[in-house]
């Protein structure tokens, strides 16, 4: 069985002067519960891309690539976690196993990990991380003769600084969603078993995540990142424009499969827009609104880039 080692993406070319070259590597991230899966499915419907089936995470999680490169995690410890956690781990909330094992054969994992350790021992941690990523995931693209790969681990934009250094050919999409809906969704997902447990905690959690992401965008350079509002993508008069700008950022011509998925499947009823109003008692709506407005004010004062998108959605809903 081929291991897929030592294969890398090669940027494509286009003759369209108004269209960027297609990126061979597209990272899509957000706060969590923000719509990254929706955006990745839209763009993953294009013939350019193969979408990684689920979050790979080894390049973004604590103990992953950023910590290896910063010297906070040893290559040996990283390799242990890769083999024993990121490749396959049990998720109690879903009563199922998750991880790379669904699409990375054990033989490929072992060969790629051994090669990673050899490169680290040779004093090349950056090259080791970069090649490990391609060794594990690029075969997904070659299996379907695709020229590019989409990866949607939640923290890819928050960790855009080190990832942009490792992958200079990559671009990033930050998916933004109304913070009240994100907070309500996250609280519902936690089911009182973990933080955040209340709407107030949910908004605090969301603000912290947004700030981490903005720091990642600054580290990578704003020209490498496109911010897209899920709320604009599913409803309103900016829907088509939002889709077009996102497509152009990735360097994609329109295709029937991608446009068809967008027009048929990406709708407001599927996005659970304003779900917070049904999740939160009516008597608490004014308090939640006030807290959210205060957060947006703080983010504006600190120059956080996505606030314009968030305010536009809020103003449209308040009108």
Protein language model annotation of sequence segments:
Residues 116-131, 136-257, 274, 278-279:
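PAPS-dependent sulfotransferase catalytic domain
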Residues 52-55, 258:
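Catalytic beta-strand/loop signature of glycosyltransferases that borders the donor
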Residues 50-53, 226:
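Conserved catalytic segments around the Walker B and adjacent sensor/switch elements
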Residues 30-31:
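P-loop (Walker A) phosphate-binding loop of NTP-binding proteins
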Residues 37-49:
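A conserved segment at the C-terminal end of the G1
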Residues 78-97, 101-106, 157-163, 197-211, ...:
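Anion-recognition interface
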Residues 1-27, 187-190, 214-223, 227, ...:
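PAPS-dependent sulfotransferases, especially Golgi type II membrane carbohydrate sulfotransferases
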Residues 55-149:
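PAPS-dependent sulfation machinery
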